[in-house]
Amino acid sequence: MPTPKERPDFFTHLQTQKPRTLPGVTHPPLKITFLGTGTSSGVPMIACDCPVCTSPDPHDNRLRSSILVESAATTLVVDTTPDFRYQMLRARVKHLDAVIFTHPHKDHVAGLDDVRAFNFFQEQEMQVYANSMTIDALMREFAYAFADKKYPGVPNLRLNPITLEPFTVGDIAVTPIQVWHLKMPVLGFRFGDFTYITDANRIDETEKAKIRGSSVMVVNALRREKHISHYTIDEAVALVHELGVPTAYFTHISHQLGLHAEVDSRLPSGLHLAYDGLVVNV
């Protein structure tokens, strides 16, 4: 598989932040692309005329949350959102080795059917990594893909159950991190020095230990007001400071958080709102 190429025309309407490369890493260099940074309804939200949803700033346009993780030899995505097809087209993804799922909520799994395009061009099954709860949901919601007699053209999926034990996808080492989305266990993941967490409002101390030492982390920051199952922006900032991670990006953002430029300008040093198309090298 070819080395990931720069995509100079990817999100050319954005003033994209220069990718950050961290010194002293021992894992394969990774390129992280934020495919989407919005909450389940996306931004703009249907039928909403608030200042964020009508903002002309492209940073305020957010597809559902997902990232693309690339090494020189392996390409994977975390979650297949309802926007997955457009996210793959927009990022010009030509090869995909695997999908890793955080949890089975629809804004994280609904686009799974569209991996069949990769089945067609790569002529092989797609490797899917998920915990047992998510696998059960996928087999129910995409039952046609797992039928004994499949209709031609349905996704060809190989389900790989994962627990909290580390595993590898190609040359990328993955450490699962269990977080809590109210009462639902959700998986975050650490890839080398990079940690990705979405849909959380609580993390046990044993799992926080897996995050410590990361150079970059991503965590959800839904809005300012308290939420039953998501961190607020203030809670997310406090978590980053508690864990001592020097650089952090906030994702899974609602239109209720406010305008990107205004919120981002008020964040402490080293902390940023992520946006669709942002690239970070670790």
Identify the function of each model-found stretch.
Residues 11-14, 22-197, 206, 262-281:
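Binuclear metal-dependent hydrolase catalytic cores
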Residues 176-177, 197-199, 219, 250-251:
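Thr-Gly-centered strand-to-loop micro-motif
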Residues 204-282:
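Binuclear metal-ion centers of metallo-dependent hydrolases, dominated by the metallo-beta-lactamase
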